[in-house]
Amino acid sequence: MAQVVAVCISEKKGERKTPVDAVELRENHGIVGDAHAGDWHRQVSLLAQESIDKMVALGLDVTAGDFAENITTSGIDLVNLPVGTRLQVGETLLEVTQIGKECHTRCAIFYQAGDCVMPKEGIFARVINGGVIKPGDGIKIVMI
């Protein structure tokens, strides 16, 4: 079963996010208290634990939030979800708006490993219905 492994926030853009016990998502805004929240298409970022594990296999000491993702998942193939897919995550509803992103500046992880998974395997979403998400919550595809 697909589920949430961790939820993470940061006060500033361009930094690693810190795992927290739960996050509150606000409709058409994102995660309350997170630097990336706002009226745009990348309100929430998701990255699979399986993607993080690829970097661990390269010898990096990385964990949830180190790639600046808000929601770390397991058991769902995020990168192959079409834009427009809706996901029920805990009590919230998210709509996938973007797969991957352009990496304008090479981050510390890129220089350490020569690669980074977030630009290729991270996805972004906007909040359709708000609520709370916490580790252990289920993830369901409700519309493709």
Listing of model-derived features with the role each one plays in the protein:
Residues 1-144:
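Metal-cofactor-dependent catalytic cores
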